[in-house]
Structure formats: structure tokens, C-alpha cells
């Protein structure tokens, strides 16, 4: 009994030293788990001898000591395997080598640099759950260690190892648990992923797909430096005249997307009269520029815009129409931002929209007028 008590004192003193030192060396953490294992063995032996209290500590049941010892052995072996690789030179804290983190999804491996992934179920901002993804996941299999990165998609959080995808968080199961299981939004790293994506149009359409034909203005009006024309208010348009290009083939349209051309026919060039901004005020729009409509172009990542467009359904009274996600076809592929266009009955309605709807910082807003 006395020998067992002395051994337990020495073992626990060593464990306390590791807590106080808070080392970042992997070899020190291996030694820590060796002593945790030894402590469990001593407790197991004490209970086996019929001892229920030692050094004023309650001796746990045999099954408890055995389970803790097995966990300590597993972690010790994991760290020893890692210690035989180049990763032993990295900084390792006690938290990063703790049992709690080891058992956190993905279980049975070490991980570093976690960040939060927020999932919103059923479009309810009050029905959200937070999950953890990891920048570095250390997989030790058959004595070999590999580092992979945790990734996120609409199905869940996963990593890829040797071509095999392993999901350690399944959003489908989580959605059934916390919602109807039909739809959810994933917010991670400044990106927004919406599921199911089928509720949105994923077609990439050109600007001609939105405005297929513009009315011809008979008279061209000169303007000041600020003008009101097709597109956004970025830049200044000059009064121009052009001739109508003859059409060689009839224009065919997609019955599912009436505004989208099926064949690569060009859109008619028209005499688009440029009207001064002063003449395009809301009060005089119906008289001086009856063919123009206030618009907003929202530019940014396609997934973020799809999510934003879905949320705009809550503010239908603040706009007239909203387009599907589209792109300019003549831009450099490296900077191919997606665009969503909204139209308004009046500029005051557009102002109310901008004052009410929260636009993400990653989405740029351009205002202007469109001839419809």
C-alpha cells in the first residue's frame, strides 16, 4: 500500500510539472501521456487490491481505469509515430495533443488551426449551428503520417486522402436533425454555399441574354458629362448613332428562359439616345425618359450572389425584377465576376432597397439606368 502510494505521488508530480511547463515539444507530450498511462495502471492495481481510496483520492472502478489507460496508450502511440516524422519539429501545445481534441471530428487524428463553419437551416437566421474545420489534419496510418486540409462543400466538411473523400460532418444528417432537411446555407471563410443549388439558375448568360432587344430612339439628345444610359453609372456615355445590322437568320429563344438566346445571333444595334442625368429624375422620368428604368448591378462571387438573390425574396416589395446570375462574356477569365441585376419602379424604391437590404462586403454595388 505504501509503495503504491509513493509511486502514485511521483507519477502525479511529474504530470503537474508538464502542466506547469506548458511545453511545445512533442517529446514532452509523449512523456506526459506515458505518466497518464502509468497513473491509470496504478489506480487499476489499487482497485484490484480492494483499495477504494489512496492519498485522499477516490480510486475509480476497474473499467474506468482500463478505458483511460487504453486512450492514453493510443495517444502515446500516435505521438510516437508523429515523432518519427518531419512534423516533430513543429510547435505542439498540450491542447493540440489533448484527448479532447483527438476525439473531436475527425476522430483519431491530430489537427491544427481550426476555424468555424456556420450552417443556417431552412433559411432561418435563428436556426444555426457551428462546426469546426481544420487547416491541417495529421493522418498517421501504418506508421506513415500525412497532412491534409479540411474542405467544405454543400454536403459537409471533409478531407481527401489518396483520392478518397472522408466526410466528418454531414450536413444532410445535420439538416434532418435541426430542420426539415430540405435546405441549408453554409458560411465559411467569407464564402456562402447554398443547398440545394437547384433552386437557383446556374446558367451563365451574357448581357444580351437579359436585354435581348432595345427600343430605337428616333432622336439623339446631347448631354452633360453625367449621362443616363444602358448599364450602370460607372463611366460616361456619349451620344452616338448607329445603323441597324441586318439579321440573316430568325431569332430562336429558349422556352424555359425566354430572355436567353439559343443560337449565337447578335442583338440588334440601336440608336440608344443618351439623356442627361438631370432629365432622368424620378419626377420627370415618365415624361422625359419614359424608356429608362433604375437598376442596380450586384457583382461578386457566384455562390454569394445566388445566396443573396435567395434572401432577396424577403424584400420583394423593394424591387420590381431580379435577374439570374450572369457574366460579361468579353472579360478576362481571371476576373470573371458574376452579376445579378435588379430593376426598380422608381429611384426612391431603389434608395429604400439600398437603405434596407444588407449587402455583403464582398459584393460591389453599381447603380444606373437601363432602357427596357
Swiss-Prot record:
GO terms for biological process: DNA replication; DNA-templated transcription; regulation of DNA replication; viral DNA genome replication. SUPFAM superfamilies: E2 regulatory, transactivation domain, Viral DNA-binding domain. Residues 235-262 are annotated as: Disordered. Residues 292-372 are annotated as: DNA-binding domain. InterPro entries: E2/EBNA1_C_sf (IPR035975), Nucleotide-bd_a/b_plait_sf (IPR012677), Papillomavirus_E2_C (IPR000427), PPV_E2_N (IPR001866), Reg_prot_E2 (IPR033668), Regulatory_protein_E2_N (IPR036050), Regulatory_protein_E2_N_1 (IPR042503), Regulatory_protein_E2_N_2 (IPR042504). It is found in: Host nucleus. Keywords: Activator, DNA replication, DNA-binding, Early protein, Host nucleus, Isopeptide bond, Phosphoprotein, Repressor, Transcription, Transcription regulation, Ubl conjugation. The keyword Repeat does not apply. Binds DNA as homodimer. Interacts with protein E1; this interaction greatly increases E1 DNA-binding activity. Interacts with protein L1; this interaction enhances E2-dependent replication and transcription activation. Interacts with protein L2; this interaction inhibits E2 transcriptional activity but not DNA replication function E2. Interacts with protein E7; this interaction inhibits E7 oncogenic activity. Interacts with host TAF1; this interaction modulates E2-dependent transcriptional regulation. Interacts with host BRD4; this interaction mediates E2 transcriptional activation function. Plays a role in the initiation of viral DNA replication. A dimer of E2 interacts with a dimer of E1 in order to improve specificity of E1 DNA binding activity. Once the complex recognizes and binds DNA at specific sites, the E2 dimer is removed from DNA. E2 also regulates viral transcription through binding to the E2RE response element (5'-ACCNNNNNNGGT-3') present in multiple copies in the regulatory regions of the viral genome. Activates or represses transcription depending on E2RE's position with regards to proximal promoter elements including the TATA-box. HAMAP family: PPV_E2 (MF_04001). This is Regulatory protein E2. The lineage of its organism: Viruses, Monodnaviria, Shotokuvirae, Cossaviricota, Papovaviricetes. The gene is E2.
